Amino acid sequence: MSELPDLSQIAPTLKAEILAEALPYIRQYHGKTVVIKYGGNAMTEERLKQGFARDVILLKLVGINPVIVHGGGPQIDQALKKIGKQGTFIQGMRVTDEETMEVVEWVLGGEVQQDIVTLINHFGGHAVGLTGKDGGLIHARKMLMPDRDNPGQYVDIGQVGEVEAINPAVVKALQDDAFIPVISPIGFGEDGLSYNINADLVAGKLAVVLNAEKLVMMTNIPGVMDKEGNLLTDLSAREIDGLFADGTISGGMLPKISSALDAAKSGVRSVHIIDGRIEHSVLLEILTEQPFGTMIRSH
């Protein structure tokens, strides 16, 4: 895995060059919102967790408004295992019965979210955690999963939702008060139920509603890969349709790429899928010229 060098070991002139390279990007994104889908190894390895917290604080300090939407699949799996329950997935979505939903709410809205918030605040930032149920943020509806074996039929995957609507007022209020919002992807339905929503889908929809300048999705691979394992650095809507059709994009990448493409088509100017295993990957993507990950284009 590639890593950034320790800044303490870099010559002063090179440090200056790095800062100078970042300047035009700081100007470009100053005052703008950047939505970051945070997940994968970056959420579990201590070095990466600390690096991410510092990176988010730096973005805020230079006038960029980061909004974090986090996942937590591995943590949910561990919690389910403790109660003797195994996670099941259909087309990249977690089957969520009532018992699983209780675990999801506790893990995402409690353990995982508070870990992120605490770390950011520990390093001097000002983060506030909330779920989609707070402030009426995410209105959800039950997801109807098409049955691929029976056209026209649907598979019941429980309390799995999709975004019906987003009310960004609470997020904007936090941004106005210089806080960093950290959002757990749990929505509420008109039926009074809580819904587990894929974090990629929430991040994409939120980026559109907030008129974000950029959407960054962190994952455990370099980006979107072809069948030979080569990184695809730039993908158009037509190319993505082809990758869906031939099965190159499958499993957990399905909702990620679908959400990224929808965001690009809906006006988010820059959409990237990046390797969260690389330290400071968010800063590399936002504040440098270095080509990184996969760019998703709407045309």
Swiss-Prot record:
Its EC number is 2.7.2.8. It is an enzyme of class 2 (transferase). One of its GO terms (biological process) is arginine biosynthetic process via ornithine. It is found in: Cytoplasm. GO terms for cellular component: cytoplasm. The keyword ATP-binding applies. GO terms for molecular function: acetylglutamate kinase activity; ATP binding. It catalyses: N-acetyl-L-glutamate + ATP = N-acetyl-L-glutamyl 5-phosphate + ADP. Gene3D superfamilies: Acetylglutamate kinase-like. Pathway: Amino-acid biosynthesis; L-arginine biosynthesis; N(2)-acetyl-L-ornithine from L-glutamate: step 2/4. Substrate binds at G72, G73, R94, N196. Pfam families: AA_kinase (PF00696). The record marks K37, K256 as: Transition state stabilizer. Keywords: Amino-acid biosynthesis, Arginine biosynthesis, ATP-binding, Cytoplasm, Kinase, Nucleotide-binding, Transferase. Catalyzes the ATP-dependent phosphorylation of N-acetyl-L-glutamate. NCBIfam families: argB (TIGR00761). Belongs to the acetylglutamate kinase family. ArgB subfamily. HAMAP family: ArgB. PANTHER family: N-ACETYLGLUTAMATE SYNTHASE, N-ACETYLGLUTAMATE SYNTHASE, MITOCHONDRIAL. This is Acetylglutamate kinase. It comes from Paraburkholderia xenovorans (strain LB400). The lineage of its organism: Bacteria, Pseudomonadati, Pseudomonadota, Betaproteobacteria, Burkholderiales.
